[in-house]
Amino acid sequence: MASRLAKSAICAARVRPVLSSRTIPAAATTLTSTRSVSNVPTEDPKTKAQSIIDALPGNSLVSKTAILSAGAGLSIAAISNELYVFSEETVAAFCLLSVFAGVAKMAGPMYKEWAETQIQKQKDILNGARANHTNAVKQRIENVKQLSGVVDITKALFEVSKETARLEAQAYELEQRTALAAEAKKVLDSWVQYEGQVKVRQQRELAQTVISKVQKELENPKVIQQILQQSVTDVERIFAAKPQ
C-alpha cells in the first residue's frame, strides 16, 4: 500500500507542470487583480472553522478535539495497516458525500422554512381549535349561569303548587259540604212536607170523625132534647144577666 502511494505521488510530480520564478509573479498579479475586481464576499475563515467545529459531535471543545484526533488516528492506522485501501471508490464516495453535503446545505434552509411553515400551520389549527373550544365552554358556562336561579324558581313553583293543591282540597271539601247541606236541606224539606201532609190528613180525619160523631149523636132525640134545653138555659141566663 505504501509503495502504491509512493508511485502515485511520483507520477503526479512528473505530470504536474513546473512553474518558473518568472511566471509566479505574473500569476500572483493576475490573481490579485481578479480578487480586487470580484465583488463576491468571501467567507470568514474563523466562521468556517467554527461551523466545522460545531458540526462535530460533542458538548465541549476538548471532546470535539478528542473525537477529531481519534478519527484521524484511526484513519491513518487503517491506511498504514492496509485495513483500508485508498482507491477510486474512496474518491467517488468523497465526491458523492460532498454533493450530498452541498445539496443539504443549499436545500436545508428551504426545507427548514417549509417545515416551520407546516409546523406553524398545525399550531394555528390547534390554537384555533383550542380557542373555539374555549369559546364554546365559556358560552356554555354563560348559558348555565342564566339558569342559576332555576332552583329558587323551582322551589317557589313547588310552594305555589302545594298552595294550589291545598286550596283545591279546601274547595273540594267545601263543595262536598255544600252538596251535603243541599241534600240534607232537600231531605228536611221533604220531611217537613211529609209532616205537613200527615198533619193535614190527621186534621181531616179528626174533623171527619168529629163531624160523623156529632151527626150520629144528633140522630139521637135525647141528645137533641138536651141540646135544646141547654140552649134555652143559656139564653135565659144571658137575658137574666142583662141589666133591666
Swiss-Prot record:
Source superkingdom: Eukaryota
GO cellular component: mitochondrial inner membrane; proton-transporting ATP synthase complex
Pfam families: Mt_ATP-synt_B
Localization (cell): Mitochondrion; Mitochondrion inner membrane
Single GO MF descriptor: proton-transporting ATP synthase activity, rotational mechanism
Residue range covered by the transit peptide: 1-36
Keywords: CF(0), Hydrogen ion transport, Ion transport, Membrane, Mitochondrion, Mitochondrion inner membrane, Transit peptide, Transport
PANTHER family xref list: ATP SYNTHASE F(0) COMPLEX SUBUNIT B1, MITOCHONDRIAL, MITOCHONDRIAL ATP SYNTHASE B CHAIN
Family: Belongs to the eukaryotic ATPase B chain family.
Record's function text: Mitochondrial membrane ATP synthase (F(1)F(0) ATP synthase or Complex V) produces ATP from ADP in the presence of a proton gradient across the membrane which is generated by electron transport complexes of the respiratory chain. F-type ATPases consist of two structural domains, F(1) - containing the extramembraneous catalytic core, and F(0) - containing the membrane proton channel, linked together by a central stalk and a peripheral stalk. During catalysis, ATP synthesis in the catalytic domain of F(1) is coupled via a rotary mechanism of the central stalk subunits to proton translocation.
Subunit field text: F-type ATPases have 2 components, CF(1) - the catalytic core - and CF(0) - the membrane proton channel. In yeast, the dimeric form of ATP synthase consists of 17 polypeptides: alpha, beta, gamma, delta, epsilon, 4 (B), 5 (OSCP), 6 (A), 8, 9 (C), d, E (Tim11), f, g, h, i/j and k.
Designated name of the protein: ATP synthase subunit 4, mitochondrial
